Every structure is written in C-alpha cells, then in structure tokens.
Amino acid sequence: STPPEKGPSEEELSELLARLVYSTMAAMPNWQIVSESEVREVGQSIPPGADMARLRKIGEMVYADALIVGRVERYRERIGNEWGAKSPASVAFALNLIDVRRGDVIWSARFDETQKALSENIFALGQIGQRGIRWLSAEQLTQEGVRKAVGELHQILVRGTAAS
C-alpha cells in the first residue's frame, strides 16, 4: 500500500496564504501594496522571529503604514474529487492588520470552515451561486476565505471606518 500523502509544510502554507492575500489585495482599487518579493527580501535581512518589533521594522523598511500578518491554523485537503468527497476540505486561518507606527493590531479576521454537504447544511444554499454544487479543495476554500476577509477589510478602509 502507498503511504498517506504528506500535506504541505508550515512554510509552504505560509507562502500559500501570503500569495492568496497579496493577489486578492492587489486586484482591489484604492490602496497601494508593497510587493510580496520586496517584503520577503527585507524580511531576510532582519533576524527571524514573529515579535512585534521585527514586524514594525519590516514595515518601516518598506515604507508601509500597516502590515497584514497571517497564520494558518488548520489545512486539511479534501479526500475524493469535486463531485464526491469521502472527507471534505477543512481550513482555518487568522489575519491581523498591524499599524506599523503604533505596533498594535487594528483589524483582524478569522476564517474557519469545513465544507459540508448540502444535505447536511440547508443554510449553505446561498453559497451555491458562488461555489456551485461541488467539493472544494483546501486551496479553493482558503481562497474563498481570503476573498471574504480582504473584501471586508477593503470596505472598512475605503469607508474610512478603521481605527486611525
């Protein structure tokens, strides 16, 4: 028998979340975004760690007002295909927007979903228009969550109701 497929590493998941957040944000109007590669390059010149001082330093070096930081909490791939899944995709992640000057979190979002069959969740009828009647991969589910979170952040910032 073949060994079970090993899922993506923590680093690969971080890169996936960063790529999805960046591409989603870059597609929206009214804000300037520092390229993912520039942030990564600057980040390599600063000693590793996830502390606020390091994040603020990266933000200052790329002349950003704020940084968005993500953390993948769960990433389980669907077992089966889009028309029949033995086990659905399950994804959880958190995003925090950090004010570079003050060093505090000014917005956060959390996405946590395990896709359910329509027969299990009649309230999912509203999602059919967006997803169709199919089982999403973990990456597709992550993309959907990123779109929701970034869309919410964009509305808040464009309306100017975020803390300043």
Residue ranges, per PLM feature:
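C-terminal/domain-edge helix-coil "capping" segments
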Residues: 58-62, 85, 98-164
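Short, hinge-like loop/turn segments at secondary-structure boundaries
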Residues: 51, 86-87
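Short, glycine/charged-enriched secondary-structure capping and boundary segments
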Residues: 13, 83-86
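Extracytoplasmic/secreted cell-surface and envelope-processing proteins
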Residues: 77-82
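Hydrophobic core residues within well-ordered beta-strands of beta-rich domains
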Residues: 66, 89-91
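Conserved beta-strand and immediately adjacent loop positions that scaffold enzyme active sites
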Residues: 92-96
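N-terminal segment of the mature soluble domain
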Residues: 1-73, 100, 104-108, 144-159
